[in-house]
């Protein structure tokens, strides 16, 4: 008996068909596994939202911290600039006070009016005018002299350079002023140098 010759083409078609059916079955299984339920999709999205909120919170905290650091830095630089300006102003005013002291010494040594020669009178008037203008300018800048004579010694405002016997004054009372002290606003620009009674 002769066997019927197998058709190679039919074998191939059968194999292809079996393979295709197998792939279709696997794809269907994968597809059914890949299809999410609405609940699982919502749960996944909620997890993502929560993770984003946490990340957003971290970024927000970092931003607030950096903003606070910058604000503190800015305020510190402003304070430093104000202090530097204040120191520069104080130094200029202190230097100017030595000029005021010199003018006061000149005026303190002016002879009595009847002893002043006529030729010297305009110069003395000029020095007096200079003193008035200096005092007016200092006052416009907030600089004022510290009261001293007749006051009790206050080390915050006065510097005692000597003590003397003075029958008409109580102890620690200022009886003479050697150098005028000045305030700039409420700060001591220069202490008054004074002589106090024992």
From Swiss-Prot:
Swiss-Prot/TrEMBL keywords: Chaperone, Cytoplasm, Stress response
GO BP terms, alphabetized: protein folding
Signal peptide, first to last residue: none
Subcellular compartments: Cytoplasm
Pfam families: GrpE (PF01025)
ATP-binding as UniProt keyword: no
Basic and acidic residues bias spans: 1-21, 44-56
GO CC annotation: cytoplasm
Main location: cytoplasm
Region called Disordered, residue ranges: 1-56
Compositionally biased region (Low complexity): 22-34
CDD domains: GrpE
Gene Ontology MF term list: adenyl-nucleotide exchange factor activity; protein homodimerization activity; protein-folding chaperone binding; unfolded protein binding
Assembly description: Homodimer.
UniProt similarity note: Belongs to the GrpE family.
Function: Participates actively in the response to hyperosmotic and heat shock by preventing the aggregation of stress-denatured proteins, in association with DnaK and GrpE. It is the nucleotide exchange factor for DnaK and may function as a thermosensor. Unfolded proteins bind initially to DnaJ; upon interaction with the DnaJ-bound protein, DnaK hydrolyzes its bound ATP, resulting in the formation of a stable complex. GrpE releases ADP from DnaK; ATP binding to DnaK triggers the release of the substrate protein, thus completing the reaction cycle.
Descriptive protein name: Protein GrpE
């Amino acid at each position: 008996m002769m066997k019927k010759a197998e058709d190679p083409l039919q074998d191939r078609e059968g194999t292809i068909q079996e393979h295709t059916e197998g792939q279709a079955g696997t794809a269907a299984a994968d597809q059914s596994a890949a299809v999410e339920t609405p609940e699982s999709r919502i749960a996944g999205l909620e997890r993502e939202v929560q993770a984003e909120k946490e990340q957003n919170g971290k970024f927000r905290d970092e931003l607030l911290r950096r903003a606070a650091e910058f604000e503190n830095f800015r305020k510190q630089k402003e304070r430093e600039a104000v202090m530097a300006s204040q120191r520069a102003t104080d130094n200029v005013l202190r230097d100017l006070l030595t000029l005021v002291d010199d003018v006061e010494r000149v005026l303190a040594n002016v002879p009595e009016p009847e002893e002043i020669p006529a030729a010297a009178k305009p110069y003395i008037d000029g020095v007096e005018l200079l003193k008035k203008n200096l005092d007016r300018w200092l006052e416009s800048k907030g600089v004022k002299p510290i009261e001293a004579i007749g006051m009790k010694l206050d080390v915050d405002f006065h510097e005692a350079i000597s003590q003397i016997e003075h029958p008409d004054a109580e102890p620690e009372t200022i009886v003479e002023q050697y150098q005028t002290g000045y305030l700039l606003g409420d700060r001591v620009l220069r202490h008054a140098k004074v002589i106090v009674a024992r």
